[in-house]
């Protein structure tokens, strides 16, 4: 799973930078989407849609309580891509 997490991170970092109009070096695992990167609700919606296309998982409708950093998003994507990890909310 560690290799997959690295792959997700490598794809997620430039995606977040593009969606939130920030330099890629600002996108670090501990960066908070709203407080640090300035994401608004439209940015979050765009990130969800782009993640669905890029990673083949839907973040919409998933339990996102506690997801506040870029690292949290990466962890959520890895969990959703793991067989058997899908909850009924993820559909």
Residue ranges of model-derived segments:
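Phosphopantetheine-dependent thiolation modules in NRPS/PKS and related acyl-activating systems
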Residues: 1-49, 53-91
């Amino acid at each position: 799973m560690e290799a997959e997490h690295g792959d997700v991170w490598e794809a997620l970092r430039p995606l977040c930078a593009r969606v939130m109009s920030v330099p890629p070096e600002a996108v670090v695992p501990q960066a908070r989407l709203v407080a640090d990167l300035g994401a608004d609700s439209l940015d979050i919606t765009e990130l969800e849609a782009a993640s669905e296309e890029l990673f083949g998982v839907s973040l919409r409708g998933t339990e996102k309580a506690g997801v506040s950093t870029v690292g949290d998003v990466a962890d959520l994507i890895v969990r959703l891509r793991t067989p058997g990890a899908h909850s009924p909310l993820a559909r």
